[in-house]
Amino acid sequence: MTKYTVFLMSGWILSAALPSLAEEVLPLSSALREGLKNHPDILAADAGLRIRLAETLAVTEIPNPRLEAEFQSLTDKPVIDLKFIQPVKRSYFGMRRNYALIEQASAQADARAQIAGVLNDVYSRYTELWTVQELQALRTQNREDLLALRDSFEKSVKAGQGGTVELALLDAEAANEAAEREALETQRLSRSAALSRRIGRQSGTVITVERPSGLSLPTDSGALERFAIRRTPLRLALLKREEAARARLLMAETDRLGPMEAKLLAQQDTDQGRLLLGVGFTMDLPIWNKNEAAIAGARASMDAARSELKQFEPARVSAVVKLRYQSALSAEQSAIRYRSEVVPLFEAALSQARDAMAKGQGSISQLQPIINRLTQTRMRAFELQISALEARAELEGALGGRLEEALATSVR
């Protein structure tokens, strides 16, 4: 037994001796469902929604009336003065109530807009974890292929058809693949923890994920473009935000005259037994302060919402979705072609070379380039798979929803 074989065995024995954690296979659908319930952004959006809904109540509150009473006794003619005072703004008459209703709808739309971002975040974390798992599996497969050649290499060395250097290099490559796989374990555990946090898992179970393939892309982007134009949650939220800002601006302009106080006056003359009634008012004259700050703030909010809405004009949305679709389709086709055509050719070449070597018709020097090219080809196929998943995620970001939802909607 060579020192390289001893190194390989000791590495695997050491890794097997480490404490193992319970693992659970989590489908993508379950991860998305749990994320919608427990994602930190969802919880924060729910809390923010409750705060905004409570704040709208303050807008509709009308100050309580104030009662002032004075008792005067001038010699033998006591007088009682009563003043009933009600603070008034023009916006109290229906306008604030209307703004509150629109603002409540805007707050709810903003909360719903968080859903698309949460789904994309969970999908990204899920894909990141799968990436590490797949890379570990790739390293394992490479190592197994190398070890499967070891007996043939050893026989060739004994038969004088190869040198010990090639055998040592084979052992070194196998050891490297094993070490690379173990080095990825830290990343796997870290990404499992990140996904667990996003979906609200509190146990110490390590999550194992499945390949997030999803549905195949449609033959054209027409249905996806229509879905994005009609369904984008962020666009709906911006529409409500612009409507709320417009109502707020109208309310601020209405209150340009400033607050007023309406008064009902009553005076009881106890000496003559008469009750004198009167009305009056006080108001701030809009000379220096014309509510410009509130008006400017409301107008800025409205302009900001309108500027953001321009990004979601149908023509722009359609163009972005079309580009994302073409990118995702190209990436997916490249990944499929490489995985189903190129990799099997190199695997077949290695198998043929191994069989020839077993029959004494080949040499170690012929196998080594094939092994290297197969390893490179598998890594390239893996990179193309990642690119395809990333392109799909970007497409779903442009859609404002999951691809499955868009395709299901187009069938109805």
List where the protein language model places each region.
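A small-residue-enriched
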Residues: 30-92, 197, 201, 225-310, ...
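Periplasmic alpha-helical coiled-coil/stalk elements that build and connect Gram-negative outer-membrane
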Residues: 117-231, 324-331, 335, 373-374, ...
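Bacterial N-terminal signal peptides that target proteins for export
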Residues: 1-8
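Acidic, low-complexity, intrinsically disordered peripheral segments
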Residues: 21, 380-412
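A short glycine-centered flexible hinge/capping loop motif at secondary-structure junctions
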Residues: 156-161, 356-361, 398
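Cleaved targeting-peptide boundary
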Residues: 21-29
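Cleavable N-terminal signal peptides
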Residues: 9, 20-21, 35
